[in-house]
């Protein structure tokens, strides 16, 4: 739900994000002069709303679900993720965002749309100077094997090209072997949640230890899909 008092929400958001940053030692990175400036991130998700906190951050938007040309997010998850990444109080403030909508208003999507987006990124990552790929999408390992192999192949190829690929462990835990695709790739960085029992658990079916990193994943306040709103 949306908070009506924007100033209060900003303060609460700042406190929560500060605690999240502290828990993963992000401040050590900031002290060495690093931020999100001059770093471009590709985000595969539900899209993005042009929130004022993302002014100047959204470099490009492509809609593989509805074919629209202007930015939108009919679910909210993509905007929430983009806020965590690039908003003023985000983890990498000022990072450039290349947003690819591959999930619909229910947060569901076709593997074929993710494959098309990944192919586009592979063909254009050098030209667009994309350094990081945030893959919020998670497909069950038991899903279509041929499509799964295509996604993993593209993900691994992007990693070999120098793109740091970060994927969620998924929300099908806490049973073993519940990490989703492409988080099961042996090459990429898979992130799980240390405060959500549903977070995917390893190992993978190839006996790879996953996830590599745990971070806060529950009740994180970020940007909403209306200006001045936070969720």
Q: Where would I find each of the regions flagged by the language model?
A:
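Active-site/binding-pocket entry motifs
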Residues: 49, 64-65, 90-91, 103, ...
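Subtilisin-like serine protease catalytic core
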Residues: 30-60, 68-112, 126-131, 160, ...
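Residue-level detector of anion-binding/catalytic polar loops
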Residues: 96, 164, 219
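Autoinhibitory propeptides
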Residues: 1-31
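Short pre-catalytic strand/loop immediately N-terminal to key active-site residues, enriched for Gly-Thr
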Residues: 65-74, 225-231
């Amino acid at each position: 739900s949306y908070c009506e008092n924007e100033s209060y929400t900003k303060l609460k958001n700042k406190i929560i994000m500060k605690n999240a940053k502290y828990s993963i030692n992000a401040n050590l990175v900031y002290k060495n002069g690093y931020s999100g400036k001059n770093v471009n991130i590709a985000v595969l998700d539900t899209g993005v709303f042009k929130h004022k906190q993302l002014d100047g951050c959204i470099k490009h938007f492509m809609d593989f679900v509805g074919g629209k040309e202007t930015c939108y997010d009919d679910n909210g998850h993509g905007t929430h993720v983009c806020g965590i990444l690039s908003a003023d109080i985000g983890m990498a403030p000022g990072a450039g965002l290349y947003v690819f909508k591959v999930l619909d208003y229910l947060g569901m999507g076709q593997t074929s749309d993710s494959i098309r987006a990944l192919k586009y990124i592979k063909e254009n990552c050098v030209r667009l100077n994309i350094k990081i790929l945030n893959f919020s999408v998670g497909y069950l390992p038991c899903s279509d094997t041929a499509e799964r192999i295509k996604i993993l192949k593209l993900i691994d190829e992007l990693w070999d090209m120098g793109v740091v690929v970060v994927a969620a462990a998924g929300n099908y835990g806490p049973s073993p072997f519940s990490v989703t695709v492409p988080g099961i790739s042996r090459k990429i960085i898979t992130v799980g949640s240390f405060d959500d029992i549903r977070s995917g658990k390893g190992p993978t079916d190839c006996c790879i230890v996953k996830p590599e990193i745990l971070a806060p994943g529950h009740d994180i306040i970020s940007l909403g899909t209306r200006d001045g709103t936070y969720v």
